[in-house]
């Protein structure tokens, strides 16, 4: 074989077990130039002739050698490409062989690891119990596909498995849920048994990242006696638990959801000092007000310990806890000016964290009343991103009212309300709590129609606190706010009067905005009356809704009825609604006067001038026979006037 085509063959085993020839190409020598030895210099002629003859022979040999080399290297490019293909096939075969071996090795190692894991689990205590219990629990957690009787049977079987071993099992991450399910679906006797087995370990249970959920379940589904057992073990450890990462949530849930006032005070009293942590008997009602009256000498110690607990809880990130809010409220209720200032400095940038609870909102309101102008600005700035949510909260909206009622810088508060409320005014006016902020701006918090007696007393209690920090007259302050918010509400009414009057709560904002907003309101009044246009006999007419007829009657009277004064208290601006409404009523006079709109017609008659009234009465008398057929009280009142 020629040099360029010399090959060696070996055999390669395929994945399927068959043999495949692998071709190995030998290395080729470098191509050399034709051989031509150096000529020697000869002085004789014979030497030259000999050399000439030799050179001719050499040329012939060289030419023949070149021809043979050309023949040998013919097709060398083709064999090189074949070699490349064969080498790539060889590498692919090797890679496939390696990957298949790696896969088989990984499967084997995975199986070995799984086997070892099972063996290790089997060696653990209660391994069989845990396995059986989890199998039963898996059936129980399928809420839709299991019947009550079947659940009861499985619970009984599960309870027999874990009984006497609850304390050991409940601290395990997988078995904690199993025991929780037994407490949730078990009988009273089964719950009492589990509770009794855990006696003496409830503090550790609350500190466990898995066990804490069982403690909460016992609070939720247990009897009052079971709750007393857990609380009894908590007594003396409350301060430590409230600062513990896991136990703090159990104490908070117990305090907020599952305890009465006396039990709450029994938990809180541990914040007053170590001497209150010693006594396990908490049957007596311990309250800080009574303590400070009976033992005034203990005030410095109690206030210092309360402050340490508050400061430590905030440092731990527990400022959102209801229990901490109660401690803060008790602290600020009995704090002197320096102590109150310390609490203000600690919490003024975290005000949004505690406005959502009853106690926390009262703390925030008192802090706003005690703060100076600079601190109020910081507090409002921290509250601004959450202003909408706070306004809609059952307690938070009172904080916003208190902040507006204390802050003299009405330019700042007006811009704040305009920026945050303007795009949400329609929704806010229909919200149960947020609308009260708008109504405060329009009529003040003294109005009993919108603010309960408790809330009015709470806001009134701030007057003495803000006397030193707020200089403006409350009426002046509110009128300045009204000048900013009033036009926004009137603009909204002009665009969406129908939507507002149709909504019971929003209609209150609409009426008071039309009565008391200090701006041009004619367009808004026309838009409101237009919503009542049409035949009152239609079922969807607004007059059939009680709040709509009441709102329209108030606008016709140009003010609200005062029970104390026994008369309508007129607004300063006369809207002249009665004169405008006649145009709408005349189209369907009998329907208005003999149906749900009868009292509105009576109010129109009372509001008109004498000349307008006489003219309207003439028109009504023409339909007296039709009106006599009506049984509506308003129609009978109207007939008396006729």
Curated annotation (Swiss-Prot):
One of its GO terms (biological process) is regulation of translation. Residues 43-55 have a biased composition (Low complexity). Keywords: Nucleus, Phosphoprotein, Repeat, Repressor, RNA-binding, Translation regulation. InterPro entries: ARM-like, ARM-type_fold, CPL_dom, PUM-HD, PUM3, Pumilio_RNA-bd_rpt. SMART domains: Pumilio. Residues 112-123 have a biased composition (Basic residues). The keyword Metal-binding does not apply. Pumilio repeats lie at residues 160-196, 197-232, 233-269, 345-381, 382-418, 420-460. This is Pumilio homology domain family member 6. The lineage of its organism: Eukaryota, Fungi, Dikarya, Ascomycota, Taphrinomycotina.
């Amino acid at each position: 074989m020629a040099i360029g085509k010399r090959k060696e063959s070996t055999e390669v085993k395929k994945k399927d077990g068959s043999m495949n020839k692998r071709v190995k190409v030998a290395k080729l020598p470098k191509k050399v130039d034709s051989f031509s030895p150096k000529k020697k210099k000869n002085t004789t002629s014979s030497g030259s002739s000999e050399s000439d003859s030799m050179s001719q022979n050499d040329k012939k040999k060289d030419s023949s050698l070149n021809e043979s080399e050309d023949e040998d290297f013919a097709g060398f490019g083709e064999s090189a490409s074949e070699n490349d293909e064969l080498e790539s096939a060889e590498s692919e075969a090797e890679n496939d062989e390696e990957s298949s071996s790696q896969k088989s090795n990984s499967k084997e190692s995975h199986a070995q690891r799984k086997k070892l894991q099972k063996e290790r689990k089997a060696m653990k205590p209660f391994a069989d119990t845990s396995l059986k219990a989890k199998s039963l629990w898996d059936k129980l957690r399928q809420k839709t596909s299991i019947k009550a009787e079947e659940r009861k049977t499985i619970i009984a079987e599960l309870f027999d498995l874990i009984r006497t071993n609850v304390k050991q099992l409940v601290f395990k991450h997988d078995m904690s849920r199993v025991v929780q399910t037994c407490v949730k679906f078990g009988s009273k006797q089964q719950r009492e048994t589990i509770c009794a087995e855990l006696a003496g370990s409830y503090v550790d249970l609350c500190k466990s990242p898995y066990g804490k959920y069982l403690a909460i379940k016992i609070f939720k589904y247990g009897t009052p006696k079971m709750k007393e057992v857990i609380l009894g073990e908590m007594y003396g450890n409350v301060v430590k638990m409230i600062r513990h990462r896991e136990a703090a949530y159990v104490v908070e849930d117990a305090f907020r959801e599952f305890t009465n006032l006396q039990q709450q005070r029994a938990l809180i009293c541990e914040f007053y000092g170590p001497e209150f942590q010693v006594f396990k008997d908490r049957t007596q009602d311990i309250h800080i007000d009574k303590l400070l009256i009976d033992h005034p000498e203990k005030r410095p110690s109690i206030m210092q310990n309360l402050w340490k607990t508050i400061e430590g809880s905030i440092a731990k990130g527990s400022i959102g806890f209801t229990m901490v809010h109660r401690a803060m409220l008790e602290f600020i209720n009995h704090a002197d000016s320096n102590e109150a200032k310390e609490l203000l400095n600690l919490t003024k940038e975290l005000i949004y964290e505690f406005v959502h609870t009853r106690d926390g909102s009262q703390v925030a309101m008192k802090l706003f009343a005690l703060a100076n102008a600079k601190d109020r600005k910081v507090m409002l700035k921290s509250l601004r991103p959450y202003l909408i949510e706070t306004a809609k909260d059952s307690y938070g909206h009172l904080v916003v009212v208190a902040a507006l009622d204390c802050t003299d810088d009405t330019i700042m508060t007006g811009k704040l309300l305009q920026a945050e409320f303007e795009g949400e005014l329609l929704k806010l006016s229909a919200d149960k709590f947020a609308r009260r902020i708008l109504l405060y701006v329009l009529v003040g918090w003294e109005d009993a129609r919108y603010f309960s007696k408790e809330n009015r007393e709470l806001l009134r209690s701030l007057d003495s606190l803000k006397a030193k920090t707020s200089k403006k007259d409350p009426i002046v302050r509110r009128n300045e706010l009204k000048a900013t918010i009033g036009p926004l509400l009137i603009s909204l009414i002009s665009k969406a009067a129908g939507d507002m009057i149709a909504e019971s709560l929003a209609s209150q904002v609409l009426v008071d905005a039309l009565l008391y907003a200090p701006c041009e309101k004619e367009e808004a009044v026309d838009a409101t009356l237009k919503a009542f246009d049409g035949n009152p006999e239609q079922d969807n007419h607004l007059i059939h809704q009680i709040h709509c007829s009441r709102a329209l009657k108030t606008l016709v009277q140009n003010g609200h009825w005062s029970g104390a004064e026994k008369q309508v208290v007129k607004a300063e601006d006369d809207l002249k609604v009665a004169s405008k409404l006649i145009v709408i009523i005349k189209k369907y006079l009998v329907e208005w006067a003999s149906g749900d709109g009868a009292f509105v017609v009576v109010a129109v008659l009372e509001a008109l001038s004498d000349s307008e009234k006489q003219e309207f009465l003439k028109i009504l008398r023409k339909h007296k026979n039709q009106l006599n057929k009506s049984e509506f009280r308003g129609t009978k009142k109207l007939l008396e006037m006729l």
